Amino acid sequence: MALDKLLENEAQSEIERIRAEARGRAEKIVADARERAQTLLDSRQRLLENQRQAGLVRARSAADLELNAARLTASESGVTQVYQMVEDYLGNVTSAPEYGNILSRLIQEGLQAVPDAEAIEVNPAEMNVARHLVSGVEVRENPSIKGGVRVVARGGKSGVTNTLSGRLERVKADMAPQISRLLAE
């Protein structure tokens, strides 16, 4: 029986060794699986965080663009309103008492630009004022002239228009940035 016992003990030892080896392999397999799962989980979390950050950047950029577009629209609207107010004022300045002085200067500047003037054209509403300001040159009515004069050269083929609204048009582009800056303050 001692041989049976010896064989049984030897078999039991072999079984324990195989079980221990199997447990070791199983623990390694489980540890490897956990490590792979953790690596995958970490990778997914980084990916999600990167996507979240990219989404935030896109949202901020879109908000900045929208804000800048709104500011630009407001600025353009403000500049347009300022120009409209100025144009309204210039449209009404012809009835102001000091308009005679303004018209006189516009006529003199026009005559300096066209020294051989044949005629000066003004709006029909300004004929009386213009006749008192001009001598030696014919004064004609021209309903298309508002707030200023057109000095016609001899022969009538050329001339210079010198109006308040024309002057405004010439300086609009230069003044727009300054007006925008003032409106933003």
From Swiss-Prot:
The keyword RNA-binding does not apply. The keyword Ion transport applies. GO terms for biological process: proton motive force-driven plasma membrane ATP synthesis. Keywords: ATP synthesis, Hydrogen ion transport, Ion transport, Transport. It comes from the Bacteria. One of its GO terms (molecular function) is ATP binding. GO terms for cellular component: proton-transporting two-sector ATPase complex, catalytic domain. InterPro entries: ATPase_E_C, ATPase_V1_Esu. Gene3D superfamilies: ATP synthase, E subunit, C-terminal, F1F0 ATP synthase subunit B, membrane domain. Belongs to the V-ATPase E subunit family. Produces ATP from ADP in the presence of a proton gradient across the membrane. This is V-type ATP synthase subunit E. The gene is atpE.
